Amino acid sequence: MRLRLIAVGSRMPKWVEEGWHEYAKRLPSELALELVEIPLNTRGKNADVARFIRQEGEAMLAKVGHNERIVTLEVHGKPWSTEQLAVELDRWRLDSRTVNFMVGGPEGLAPEVCARADQRWSLSPLTLPHPLVRILIGEQLYRAWTVLSGHPYHK
């Protein structure tokens, strides 16, 4: 099973890349974690933001295969405890489809992406910086795996 984070934005600070890679490499090969970056359209003073969101959404969905699972990261999604995420991760492993975690740009996800979601996940009711969200997703997936495998990381 593959886990993919499809996120709008590229050229992250070094600390973000290092944090992401640290958790991605900790996961076993049967739970490979991959990052797919969608370039952020440049927003100017008179930018057509709605068009940019739509274009970014189309680019995100173009990276998703026909039968792959989509989990959107949304403020109004369902909050999962670590244990609940571990249960979901176990279900996804049994399902064996690729799981795509979708993180939008500064204005959020395109409605078309949200409409395709199999599940909606909220990391927090707080507004979080998108670079930090990448690391949090990687860490939480790793932590969920440690719960399932009995690893002492989650104690």
UniProtKB/Swiss-Prot annotation:
Recorded catalytic activity of this chain's protein: pseudouridine(1915) in 23S rRNA + S-adenosyl-L-methionine = N(3)-methylpseudouridine(1915) in 23S rRNA + S-adenosyl-L-homocysteine + H(+)
GO CC annotations, alphabetized: cytoplasm
Record localization: Cytoplasm
Primary location recorded for the protein, binned into one broad class: cytoplasm
A GO molecular-function descriptor: rRNA (pseudouridine-N3-)-methyltransferase activity
Name of the top EC class for this enzyme: transferase
Binding site for S-adenosyl-L-methionine: 73, 104, 123-128
Domain of life where this protein originates: Bacteria
Family: Belongs to the RNA methyltransferase RlmH family.
Summary of subunit composition and partner proteins: Homodimer.
Protein name: Ribosomal RNA large subunit methyltransferase H
Natural source organism: Pseudomonas fluorescens (strain ATCC BAA-477 / NRRL B-23932 / Pf-5)
